[in-house]
Amino acid sequence: MDPINKIINFLFPLLTLYALLVFYPTYQRLKSVVSICRNLFPENVAGKVVVITGAASGIGEALAYEYGKRGAYLALVDIRGDPLFHVAALAELYGSPEVMPLVADVSKLEDCERFIRATVLHFGRLDHLVTNAGVAPLYLFEDIDDLSKASPAMDINFWGSVYCTFYASPYLKKSRGRIVAIASGCGYIASPRLSFYCASKAALIAFYETLRTEFGSEIGITIVAPGVVDSELSRGKFMTKDGNLVVDKELRDVQVSVLPVESAERCAKAIMKSVCRGDRYLLEPSWIGCVILWKVFCSEVTESIARWLLMAGPTLPVTEAPTKKILDVANAFRSFFSLPHY
């Protein structure tokens, strides 16, 4: 096999270059035609049944309202009961014919089976599955004392989506429905203190890309990679190395700094349009794509910049990171001109 690999190593770059010069322009023209058609004839989700996990806040909440405005039946899932019922009531006011709130923990296999089956039993079908539930562990890998405390990142962010997809896929095949996987820009771009979060989102992207090859046209899959969106996460709610959820505004200032925080409403509108067009991917905001290109072609540069900006040094507190200092300067500047702070 080694000689064959040597031949492929020599020929494949040449064939790839030729294909890019000859095939790629035609491919892009065809994609443009398909894109125009999808924009002219988007999917109508009125009357369709949609399951949204992590629906009590953030992107999940905003998507519930967007689907509701378009007349979809909703099964909203979250582990937090009170805010979930509030979102369900608002989604009906926005126009959903019927909303079923379901309190469940997506990290538990039996809970996922229960709410998928409850949805199908109640509404008689399932058309869209939005896997949105997630947590953000935020700490340095070397600071971990008990590695088992890191498991919620994979249990919720990755396995929670896998469990839902496992039980929903037979019904989605019947309706030729769609999975909307809410991943993250961190699934493509590494960031200090987010090792488990980045890993879980990268796994999610790879999982759904593989399912595309298995499901073919039976189930559509839209993989969404948002940037920093206004949510509990962007406001400083993180999972500590002990597995507890806490609000840490100082750590939030270090990690988010002056990055533009997109409103959940704007992000949800972009996702909704992308889903109705049948897009395979959505980067929201689109400038994330430029960062990914920098990572592909200049990975050493992007990694060095991330380390320099977000790491304070071995003997310094985390609040001494350059990102925090940049934020302090920006807020001082905005105070001088009486502008709202970041």
Cite the ranges covered by each PLM segment.
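Conserved glycine-rich cofactor-binding loop
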Residues: 49, 56-57
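Conserved glycine-rich Rossmann-like NAD(P)H-binding loop of the short-chain dehydrogenase/reductase
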Residues: 70-87
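The beta1-alpha1 cofactor-binding region of Rossmann-like NAD(H)/NADP(H)-dependent oxidoreductases
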Residues: 81-82, 103-115, 147
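Conserved mid-core segment of classical short-chain dehydrogenase/reductases
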Residues: 121, 136-151, 193-196
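Active-site helix of classical SDR
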Residues: 165, 200
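Residue(s) in the substrate-gating loop at a strand-loop-helix junction
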Residues: 184
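SDR active-site lid
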Residues: 213-288
